[in-house]
A protein has these predicted regions:
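Tandem amphipathic alpha-helical repeat scaffolds
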Residues: 24, 60, 64-65, 85-92, ...
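Amphipathic alpha-helical segments of tetratricopeptide repeats
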Residues: 6, 43-47, 63, 67, ...
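Alpha-solenoid helical repeat architecture
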Residues: 12-13, 51-56, 94-99, 118, ...
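TPR-repeat structural position
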Residues: 35, 55, 76, 93-96, ...
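Primarily a tetratricopeptide repeat
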Residues: 36, 40, 60, 81, ...
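Amphipathic helix-loop-helix modules that constitute alpha-helical solenoid scaffolds
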Residues: 63-71, 77-81, 176-262, 374-388, ...
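Hydrophobic, small-residue-rich alpha-helical packing segments that form membrane-like cores
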Residues: 268-275, 287-399
Length: 411
């Protein structure tokens, strides 16, 4: 401590000059000394600094001194919290590689048996959340094998179907991005089965048409605002089913029209007769598209599209609202009004999707925007530049058979 004071690294009134700390650490040349310096800095900052900005600076020193901390400190929950907060801050600001770096160090601070609540410094909820968040961040950066390894641990140790649902969704997204839609859909169907919804059985267009007509009969007799005002279920299983169904719709849309048709009907039935969930705003747009295209049922299609707009306005979830807005404006909106009228909403969706960190949502939104600009006859040089530049941060986007193929075609 006297050495820190004499070198003006620690001020006597307990106010830190963090830039001096960083300079002192970077001036050292021996690896072990640098690591030890970061350890000392992190300990000093933990003792004297407690505001948000200092916690983010502290996280870097904790990460760089992690080996010493792990060898000397048994209970590391506070260190994990600091690293977790830093990862969240980095992710929200768009620094996703930095966020992954913090997540990895946070994982390293877990105990040897991090899933057993009976062990010291082990908390099941924390371990579950950390594995899923790290896997999702690793996938978004193209580290698919790392993500799958983390997800496997969740499947192995997760206590309930709800606990494992997010892991199944991420696994499905990984395979969908790789173009392996059957394995992607299998992951989601397995998740739904664990949640008590069995949709894997064979079906036919005739059976789906019968189910559609039964649903149509109910919707024709129901006031649209009654459906719009239906409260979100408080049952976590029902809420989770809605999330997984929305993901399944996005997978089947691209290469399995029959299953997509079946899913759209089942999603609406679940919302009406089991319990409400926010993702129905996406399901309404899909079902409206089916009514328009397969049955030329303009009355029901318009009713469903109006319901979708009403539900989007009420949707409390940014992710669902962004995705629902893209589905509505690109697949339904142009059937109800001028195509140019959908452009502002798509522009907003592009900006929002890039902050969500989901490569699929970002790519679908960008490709929808590119196609709309092409259809409206915008300057082709600008359209081409948009296609080249907007998706450049998405790994291997041109090989993605969903939004990537559309964007390549426009370009």
């Amino acid at each position: 401590m006297l050495s820190l004071l004499s070198n003006h690294i620690l001020i006597r009134d307990r106010r830190f000059a963090n830039d001096r700390l960083v300079q002192a650490a970077s001036s050292l040349t021996e690896g072990r000394n640098v690591e030890k310096m970061h350890f000392i800095i992190s300990q000093a900052m933990r003792k004297y600094y407690h505001d948000g900005r200092s916690r983010y600076s502290m996280a870097r020193h904790i990460a760089l001194g992690s080996r010493i901390i792990k060898s000397r400190v048994v209970e590391r929950l506070e260190y994990r919290k600091i690293l977790w907060d830093a990862a969240q801050t980095a992710a929200q600001s768009g620094a996703r590689p930095t966020a992954l770096w913090y997540y990895r160090h946070c994982i390293a601070f877990l105990q040897d048996n991090p899933w057993d609540d009976n062990c010291i410094d082990v908390y099941y909820d924390e371990t579950l959340r950390l594995h899923i968040s790290t896997a999702e961040m690793a996938w978004s950066q193209g580290f698919n094998n790392e993500a799958l390894d983390l997800l496997y641990k969740v499947f192995q140790h997760g206590k309930t179907a709800v606990c494992k649902s997010r892991a199944w969704i991420i696994k499905a997204k990984i395979y969908a991005q790789l173009g392996d839609h059957p394995r992607s859909m299998n992951s989601l169907l397995t998740c739904l089965e664990e949640l008590g919804i069995h949709l894997r059985g064979p079906t036919s267009y005739e059976e789906c048409d019968t189910a559609y007509n039964q649903l149509k009969g109910h919707l024709d007799q129901t006031d649209i605002m009654t459906i719009a005002r239906k409260p979100i279920s408080k049952d976590i299983t029902t809420i989770t089913i809605g999330i997984v169904m929305a993901e399944a719709m996005s997978v089947t849309f691209w290469d399995d029209g029959l299953t997509f048709y079946k899913m759209a009907i089942e999603m609406m039935n679940l919302h009406l007769f089991r319990g409400g969930f926010a993702q129905i705003c996406i399901g309404c747009s899909h079902l409206a598209m089916i009514s328009f295209s397969r049955f030329r049922d303009l009355k029901l299609a318009i009713k469903l599209s109006e319901l979708s707009v009403s539900l989007l306005d009420r949707c409390p979830e940014l992710w669902t609202r962004s995705r629902g807005s893209v589905v509505y404006n690109f697949y339904i909106g142009h059937l109800r009004g001028p195509l140019a009228a959908t452009l502002p909403a798509l522009e907003n969706s592009v900006e929002t999707s890039l902050t969500l960190g989901d490569p699929y949502i970002a790519l679908i939104t960008i490709s929808s925007m590119g196609m709309t600009r092409l259809f409206l006859g915008h300057d082709l040089v600008q359209v081409e530049a948009f296609c080249n530049e907007s998706a450049e941060e998405i790994n291997d986007w041109a090989s993605d058979t969903r939004g990537g193929a559309s964007l390549v075609t426009v370009r």
